[in-house]
Regions:
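Small/polar loops that bind or transfer phosphate-bearing groups
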Residues: 96, 122-123
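Catalytic cores of alpha/beta
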Residues: 119, 126-131
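Conserved N-terminal beta1-alpha1 strand-loop-helix module at the mouth
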Residues: 1-105, 110-117
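Short beta->alpha connector loops
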Residues: 62, 124-126
Length: 131
């Protein structure tokens, strides 16, 4: 069955972004850096805890509605992440897709630094470089 054209367009955009990132920081260096990262926070345990688990998502824009005005800087992303954790969120996703959601890995980093709960990268993952 052929892949829908919209999906091809999205994947092509992600692959172009990955190629640009890899031109700046080679995959070998990314792998080396990953060895020094903090231990991942356990999202599965957070979701399987007794009671109702809450997952939320941070994104700077929505393709059909445009930008979310109050998320205009890394500081605003960090502040929102902190506020959501204080409100009781158990797992937080951060939209890193630049083309449609105006997200970035920097958004993911500042959100993760602002909270103690597990973070999930929300993006189209098509290449080992992205992991």
């Amino acid at each position: 069955m052929p892949t829908p054209i919209a999906v091809d367009h999205l994947v092509a955009g992600v692959l172009a972004d990955v190629a640009a990132r890899e031109a700046r920081v080679p995959f070998k260096e990314v792998k080396a850096r990953s060895r020094d990262m903090d231990t991942p926070r356990d999202a599965a345990t957070a979701l399987l805890r007794p009671g109702c688990s809450i997952i939320t998502e941070i994104k700077r824009a929505v393709p059909y509605a445009g930008e979310i005005a109050h998320l205009d800087s890394p500081q605003s992303v960090a502040a929102l992440a902190h506020d959501l954790e204080q409100a009781g969120v158990h797992v937080m996703a951060c939209q890193t897709d630049r083309r449609r959601f105006h997200g970035s890995l920097e958004d993911m980093r500042v959100a993760r630094d602002a909270v103690d709960i597990p973070m999930v990268c929300r993006d189209i993952i098509v290449d080992p470089y992205q992991i």
